A protein has these predicted regions:
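Short, well-structured alpha-helical segments in soluble
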Residues: 61-76
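Short beta-strand/turn micro-motifs composed of small residues
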Residues: 12-13, 106, 120-122
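A nucleotide-sugar donor-handling region in carbohydrate enzymes
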Residues: 113-161
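N-terminal pre-catalytic "stem/leader" segment of glycosyltransferase-like enzymes
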Residues: 1-65
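Short His-centered aromatic/hydrophobic patch
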Residues: 83-85
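Structural motif
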Residues: 8, 78-79, 117
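Glycosyltransferases and closely related glycan-assembly transferases
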Residues: 23, 31, 75-79, 89-103
Length: 161
């Protein structure tokens, strides 16, 4: 009898509903291809000061002036999916602690090369990089908050999950 290993995804979002919809949509697409998934949501705007620039948030996390361990234990995480400016330093910090992969939706505004994948809308016209995935439109349809089958296939191929 084959025992399936649980795949653990941490979603990091800011206070915007659109950010939550995008990370949940991508997690749902991954869930279709993996049977046993554990999903946890972390709200970055409740953990870090949102008015600070990303580099400063990241630095404060590194030197333990912002302590997220009390709010979140570094359990076994296979993947982090984050969206929103303030979520990106938290995503990188936790990635370093757990040695997992991470995907950021939209521009993280700093340390772009340290993200495994960054999902960017094609209309934003960023300079191409190996870790960028360009998409047309949003990950999820705002009307029904579901990801299309075409996008599920697209992400499965691009993310190698």
């Amino acid at each position: 009898m084959k025992v399936q290993v649980q795949y653990s995804i941490l979603l990091i979002v800011d206070e915007k509903i659109s950010s939550s919809n995008q990370v949940i949509g991508l997690a749902e697409a991954i869930k279709i291809h993996k049977k046993e998934i554990k999903i946890k949501i972390l709200y970055s705007h409740k953990l870090v000061p949102t008015l600070l620039p990303n580099w400063m948030i990241y630095y404060l996390l590194k030197v333990n002036l912002i302590n997220v361990k009390s709010k979140f234990e570094y359990e076994k995480i296979n993947l982090i999916i984050s969206c929103g400016r303030v979520s990106s330093p938290l995503s990188l910090f936790i990635k370093e602690k757990t040695q997992c992969k991470n995907i950021h939706i939209l521009d993280p505004y700093f340390k772009r090369k340290e993200f495994d994948k960054i999902i960017i809308p094609k209309h934003d016209k960023y300079k191409k990089s190996d870790n960028y995935i360009e998409i047309i439109g949003a990950i999820v349809n705002n009307n029904n908050k579901k990801i299309s089958l075409e996008k599920i296939k697209f992400f499965k191929n691009k993310l190698s999950i």
